[in-house]
């Protein structure tokens, strides 16, 4: 009998109502806002309300430098969380949110795989509660305000050839990597070369993941540097009066999302900064809540140990104040063979490569 696909397994799963999942980790109803039957947002007041509860053991899952296909950190994280529950330990897992670009690319979704998945499958990998779209909108709001500032006379003296803030989109669109904006009539803006990055690479996404409160996020957004003046001085979002607008757009996005695994293990899924251009870890607020919800909080550091794990220890943990108790390193023969320089890992993994 052939092995069912990940999607078939996910669709055959029996899920708990999200209110029951929240109850399992001690979240009262007033701290949980359902988004349908199987997803919810957690109010940030939970950080204070749960603070007096015992602290869970904090476990980080990382990996050797992965191949383009990924080596299974998420699958291992989910499987470990489910296994803890099988031996009578109350475990919660904490993961980054999926980016739609890689979901439709060679790497695929971010739900795990096989019988170690976070569900609902489609919601997790596409849109979820709209956090990605909120980050996209906030980022592009700042881009629009920057271009409008240039059009309105450039009072700050911004050097048009030294602007570092581009636009973002949660789609792998090669044709938008480098573009020229402001073409057309004079009222259509100042022509200049810019481009699009993917939303997960946005500094606004990194800010979302590192913020400890709404006020902290407001301050961090205001400190974003968008470019430099002709005198070489940095120009910030605060100087463009964009920090408040960005915060309002992202006000719901800062609340962590609650889902579950195939075996009903609670999963906090929040924020998705990349590990190559940012710190590659799920949100600080998600872990500040999750650390008081059971015996173990198991989180994943994105990319390889030299990227996500290094930044987990040196950036995320310093912001959250949480210290890990153990680390799990995922290692595959496929990755080791790929790094030997003798094998090129592509879409199909033929038998001799695995």
Regions found by a protein language model. Give the residues of each.
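Flexible phosphate-sensing "switch/lid" loops adjacent to ATP/NTP-binding sites
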Residues: 1-353
